[in-house]
């Protein structure tokens, strides 16, 4: 698995965490098996007694769907921004003025 594949898988895992409640059971099952459980398309197809192509199409469409949710709702983006701010805050605990600026940045995200 290449670096880009790992980055995509990690992103999809986060998007799945944020948006899984908006998906159908079938969409949830396919994404969970493919990205979280690392099943192959063939294994998923065998599990659900469908074609490999049907699984691929469903995973691709569902991936596009959660990306669209992210584009509109930005839950993952805001999560990443908050995490960066928290990391920076930890580096500046002895500087109250800087901590106050970080708190303001966090409030602005909400």
Curated annotation (Swiss-Prot):
Organism the protein comes from: Staphylococcus aureus (strain Mu50 / ATCC 700699)
Extent of the signal sequence: none
Family: Belongs to the UPF0122 family.
Role according to the record: Might take part in the signal recognition particle (SRP) pathway. This is inferred from the conservation of its genetic proximity to ftsY/ffh. May be a regulatory protein.
Protein name, entry field: UPF0122 protein SAV1236
SUPFAM superfamilies documented for this protein: Sigma3 and sigma4 domains of RNA polymerase sigma factors
Listed transmembrane segments: none
Gene3D superfamilies assigned to the protein according to its UniProt record, in alphabetical order: Winged helix-like DNA-binding domain superfamily/Winged helix DNA-binding domain
Pfam families listed in its UniProt record: UPF0122
